[in-house]
Amino acid sequence: GREWVTMFSKENIATFDYVFTDAMTWTDTKGRRMRLWMPEEVFVDDKDDFMDQLVGQIVGVMQDEPIDMYVNSTFLPDILQPEYDTLWTEERMDKVIQAAVANDIAIEINARYQIPSATFIKSAKAAGVKFSMGTNNTDKNLGTLDYAIQMITECGLEPDDFFKVVKK
């Protein structure tokens, strides 16, 4: 959840090589706490309203939390997955991309969920966003980065397009 920021002092956070998070746990405007990967905890009364709230959460995380990488970047709950390309409009993608640029935050290319889309990655690359690769897996597929490798080729990513740890 969002409370992780209060669980560590600023001094402790400053000692980390890097910090990553997502917005997969949040509370909607009706006060309902959601964990987006758990279908029974997701509330979608109106798809566009949900998406606008989700984008607002993502942008808020990028603006307000001391992170280096944003992971599970364009994750949608199961109920919305079939409409991924429709719901992730150019305007919504641009808000997330601009927040990443403004706050110098890398975006994860997630091999497990196969997100973000090539369209998002190409737009983010053009805007100067850096990338990382990850899986969010806890099973035998941990470390399997096939989708990320595919996106490197498809989107023309080069080594300089990737996040690099800077020793503090």
Residue ranges, per PLM feature:
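Extended substrate/RNA-proximal surfaces in nucleic-acid metabolism proteins
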Residues: 1-102, 157
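Charged catalytic cores and adjacent phosphate/nucleic-acid-binding surfaces used
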Residues: 84-168
